[in-house]
């Protein structure tokens, strides 16, 4: 067991009941283009086209051969683009049950499949996009290989579901997915989990590792740091546990599996719980009548790293297993910093709230202050468990010093790894975006 001592479990109210419920009927789904780092689409469909489930919607010009497929059967009703014609979303109205089918195999055959057979089926089905590289967090090139694949079978994000509930419900498919991954990599598959019991693969190159401690103990970046540190030459891939289940279902049934179990939770959700829905589901429909009155913000993903689900982005993200809802923090509080703060949370124990152990807070979207200088008071060191100098790294990200940032470990990181630094920062810096700008520069300039 690897125990993480530094970090922070956010004491936010509205945790979900850990029972899986059926979600609302969904009539619209979407693929969100901006989720895929560096992707430039070649469109295969236009508004008005009828599509089958698993039919190709677009391919990536920059990553030749990588295909993005429809999670449902229906009709393309919107292709939304932003500034410089960046693809925002392809929206599909759900209709019918036609689908593209693929080869299916017996469970005993999976570990012995040729890598090319596995790769071809994953690419054609669109499930290849479930894999992401580290560094850079991009969909891997089709011809690339890796010596390490990390399966994130735990989740320490605030308000998250317990993965073991979902995995044990789909035990056969999860093991089948691990067998597929074991044949896909040159060396090891690392299944990173909490202390709970999970279905196990019998393949010798599939290893289980237990992590314990506060968030970010459940992030792929943390697991890689301790088990297989990445750099420009050591590239690892990561995948979440629900996509492993989808891999298994694809090879066992020959059909694209797009079910998702997500946590619908937050301080303003009437009945926080786990709901079964589909990949890319409309969050306007999924959250309809689920929230308390007032102005709220629906977030696809965690409250720390998720995206504001509004307009053309109001759909469940490809890599998101949560839907979080917070009240918009519009109210101004005169001299709020000078009040005792019984109902306020503070990492630095500036308010009385820290005296009440176990207290949960109705957190909002407010940043509790305006932008200001980066102040190194030890906050970052409290929440970063990795063997690096977070204050120096964050300073370099602010200054745009990519050489120094790379030397300090920036290539190991993804936006989610710095989310707690953003949360505890007195200067209100968005370190995730600064990291992405740095990584883009490093990749472009070599």
Curated annotation (Swiss-Prot):
Disulphide-bonded residues: none
Keywords: Ion transport, NAD, Sodium, Sodium transport, Translocase, Transport, Ubiquinone
The protein's Enzyme Commission number: 7.2.1.1
Enzyme class: translocase
Reactions performed catalytically: a ubiquinone + n Na(+)(in) + NADH + H(+) = a ubiquinol + n Na(+)(out) + NAD(+)
GO biological process, one term: sodium ion transport
Transmembrane annotation, as ranges: none
GO molecular function: oxidoreductase activity, acting on NAD(P)H, quinone or similar compound as acceptor
Subunit text: Composed of six subunits; NqrA, NqrB, NqrC, NqrD, NqrE and NqrF.
Family the entry assigns: Belongs to the NqrA family.
Role description: NQR complex catalyzes the reduction of ubiquinone-1 to ubiquinol by two successive reactions, coupled with the transport of Na(+) ions from the cytoplasm to the periplasm. NqrA to NqrE are probably involved in the second step, the conversion of ubisemiquinone to ubiquinol.
Protein name as catalogued: Na(+)-translocating NADH-quinone reductase subunit A
Organism annotation: Vibrio vulnificus (strain YJ016)
Designated gene of the protein: nqrA
């Amino acid at each position: 067991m690897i125990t993480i001592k530094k970090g922070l479990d956010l004491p936010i109210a509205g945790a979900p009941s850990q029972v899986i419920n059926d979600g609302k009927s969904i009539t619209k789904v979407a693929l969100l283009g901006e989720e895929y780092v560096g992707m430039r689409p070649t469109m295969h469909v236009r508004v008005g086209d009828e599509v089958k489930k698993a039919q190709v919607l677009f391919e990536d010009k920059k990553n030749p051969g990588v295909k993005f497929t429809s999670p449902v059967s229906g009709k393309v009703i919107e292709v939304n683009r932003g500034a410089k014609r960046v693809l925002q979303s392809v929206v599909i109205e759900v209709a019918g049950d036609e689908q593209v089918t693929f080869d299916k195999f017996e469970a005993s055959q999976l570990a012995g499949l040729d890598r090319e057979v596995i790769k071809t089926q994953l690419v054609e089905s669109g499930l290849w996009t479930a894999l992401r590289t580290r560094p850079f967090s991009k969909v891997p090139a089709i011809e690339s290989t890796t010596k390490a694949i990390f399966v994130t079978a735990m989740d320490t994000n605030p308000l998250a579901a317990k993965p073991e509930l979902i995995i044990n419900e789909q035990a056969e498919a999860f093991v089948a997915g691990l067998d597929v991954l074991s044949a896909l990599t040159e060396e090891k598959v690392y299944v990173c989990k909490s202390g709970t019991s999970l279905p196990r693969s019998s393949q010798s190159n599939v290893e289980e590792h237990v992590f314990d401690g506060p968030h970010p103990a459940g992030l792929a970046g943390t697991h890689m740091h301790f088990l297989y540190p990445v750099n420009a030459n050591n590239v690892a891939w990561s995948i979440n546990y629900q996509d492993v289940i989808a891999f298994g279902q694809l090879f066992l049934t020959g059909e694209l599996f797009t079910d998702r179990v997500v946590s619908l939770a937050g301080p303003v959700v009437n009945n926080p719980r786990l709901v079964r829905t589909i990949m890319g589901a409309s969050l306007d429909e999924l959250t309809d009548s689920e929230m308390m009155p007032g102005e709220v913000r629906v977030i696809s993903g965690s409250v720390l790293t998720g995206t504001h689900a509004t307009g053309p982005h109001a759909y469940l993200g490809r890599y998101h297993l949560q839907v979080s809802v917070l009240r918009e923090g519009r109210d101004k509080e005169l001299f709020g910093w000078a009040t005792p703060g019984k109902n306020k949370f503070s990492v630095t124990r500036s308010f009385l709230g820290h005296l009440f152990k176990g207290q949960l807070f109705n957190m909002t979207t407010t940043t509790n202050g305006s932008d200001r200088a980066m102040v190194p008071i030890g906050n970052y060191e409290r929440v970063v468990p990795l063997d690096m100098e977070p204050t120096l790294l964050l300073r370099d990200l602010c200054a745009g010093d990519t050489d120094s940032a790379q030397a300090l470990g920036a290539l190991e990181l993804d936006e989610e790894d710095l989310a707690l630094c953003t949360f505890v920062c007195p200067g209100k810096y968005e370190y995730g975006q600064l990291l992405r700008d740095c990584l883009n520069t490093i990749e472009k300039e070599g």
